[in-house]
Design a protein with these regions (language model features):
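Structured inter-helical modules in multipass membrane proteins
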Residues: 88-186
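Transmembrane signal-anchor/signal-peptide helices with a preference for the extracytoplasmic
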Residues: 59-80, 243
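Amphipathic, cytosolic membrane-interfacial segments at TM-TM junctions
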Residues: 37-40
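A generic, lipid-embedded transmembrane alpha helix
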Residues: 47-64
Length: 270
């Protein structure tokens, strides 16, 4: 959707307001300004009829609200898992020391790329960073070098890293990749336009039903449409504001990742 190109909280609010104005005006014009619904003056619809499309619209909004909450919950879990995996990688000792130092540098490079590129105000986790991916690959390659050097006995002068520690690092790397993939998949929202178009169309049908039930009185119909469209605007706004956990209202803050990066830069890790 066009509003997704803007970062401000006002973008989805104004976009949904425009949707609802368009729905209300088009419904009013179709019902009261054309002959399509003129027969309802003499043969009106039963008032309970308007509840059917409205209930369907309410169910759709409930479904989309649930999806928005799940997105936020999954995004928060992914952030926790990502920071936890990085902390585990940093806290497991690697021998010889030069491998430990290079691993820390790769982690620092990964965090820097993730925070400046993927979490940036420009991308909002919508696309992956090639630098971050390269840092992950180099980090994993470094771990395998440690394992290979010990297995071949190439570093007899140094204490080899315990195989259990290497297994733990490899598992943490897998957890880190999975958490990053989940974060990026939640940030990519380009494929949901069809759902919004169907929601707008269902809202239009519900507004049309509200106007059609009041066909005999234009003023009453206009009042009902205004109230319904205002309610629809609030529903649309709430969903659009929270559907993406990395943009607009209540967006996640990568503070745990930033804290780890600051710790690495200050040299507190080995």
């Amino acid at each position: 959707m066009i509003y997704e190109s803007f970062n401000g909280v006002a973008a989805p609010i104004l976009a949904t307001f425009a949707w609802c104005i368009g729905i209300g005006l088009s419904s009013y014009c179709l019902v009261f300004k054309t002959r399509l619904f003129s027969h309802l003056i003499t043969s009106p619809l039963a008032p309970p009829f308007l509840a059917l499309p409205a209930i369907m619209f309410a169910f759709l909004m409930a479904f989309m609200s649930s999806e928005a909450w799940q997105n936020f919950s999954h995004a928060r879990t992914a952030l926790i898992n990502e920071s936890s995996a990085i902390s585990q990688i940093l806290n497991i000792p690697i021998q010889p020391p030069e491998f430990q130092k290079s691993s820390n540098l790769y982690v620092q490079s990964y965090l820097g790329s993730v925070l400046t590129d993927e979490w940036s105000a420009k991308h909002h986790n919508e696309s992956s960073s090639l630098e971050a991916q390269n840092s992950l690959d180099k980090l994993e390659s470094n771990v395998w070098k440690v394992s290979g050097a010990c297995n071949q006995g190439a570093n007899k002068s140094h204490t080899c890293t315990d195989p259990i520690a290497i297994s733990a690092i490899i598992k943490a790397l897998g957890d880190l990749r999975n958490a990053r993939t989940q974060r990026l998949s939640l940030g990519y929202q380009e494929g949901v336009d069809t759902k919004w178009f169907l929601g707008i169309f269902l809202g239009f049908i519900a507004a049309l039903a509200v106007a059609a039930v009041h066909r005999s009185n234009a003023k009453t119909g206009a009042t009902a449409l205004v109230l319904f469209c205002l309610s629809m605007w609030i529903s649309f706004s709430m969903v659009t504001l929270y559907i993406n956990p990395y943009k607009w209202a209540d967006r996640l803050d990568p503070a745990p990742l930033g804290l780890i990066l600051e710790t690495l830069k200050s040299g507190h890790n080995r």
